[in-house]
A protein has these predicted regions:
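An alpha-helical, amphipathic repeat domain used for nucleic-acid recognition
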Residues: 1-163
Length: 165
């Protein structure tokens, strides 16, 4: 199915550019569009530029604080919580973005810990998910199906949510 390809074949290492100025410009273009982790930026730059050039440009972007993996991890964790993702699903998503385990743990601790009122944001998200998506199954008495669906989504509090609803 050739019509699905982007039309570009991967470049061989000897075909990749070593021009740091062009790589820097490309990095700025990518970062202007969306925030990226250092791993994501490196992967995208490495498609057109050599490994050394890509690594140098990423290091420069980190040094200039255009890229901050801790900030990216926390921002992404907030977005995942808003999307009603479990802590486990959020951790997996952040790992796929190329973030270090320490940054992931720190971001998840900041976002998913209970607030001063004692309310657990992950439990609230699970309850909202149950109320929205699985209300009809609960009304039909199929709590087992709801709990199984929550377990597939990586929830650990599904029993408490099932009893509350």
């Amino acid at each position: 199915m050739a019509f699905y390809s982007r039309g570009r074949r991967p470049l061989a290492e000897e075909e990749k550019s070593t021009d740091a100025a062009k790589a820097r410009t490309r990095a700025m273009e990518l970062l202007a569009g969306q925030e990226l982790s250092s791993g994501q930026l490196y992967e995208r730059l490495n498609r057109r530029y050599t490994q050394q050039t890509s690594a140098a440009v990423v290091a420069e972007m980190v040094q200039r604080e255009y890229i901050n993996d801790a900030r990216y991890a926390e921002t992404r964790a907030h977005a995942l919580l808003a999307a009603k993702k479990s802590r486990r699903a959020a951790a997996q998503n952040l790992r796929q973005k190329g973030l270090a385990a320490g940054e992931i743990q720190q971001a998840l601790d900041a976002v998913y810990t209970p607030d001063v009122s004692g309310e657990d944001p992950e439990l609230e998200a699970a309850a909202a998910l149950v109320e929205g998506h699985y209300r009809k199954k609960l009304e039909a008495g199929r709590r087992d199906l709801v709990i199984a669906a929550l377990q597939r989504r990586g929830r650990s509090e599904e029993r408490r949510v099932g009893k509350e609803c």
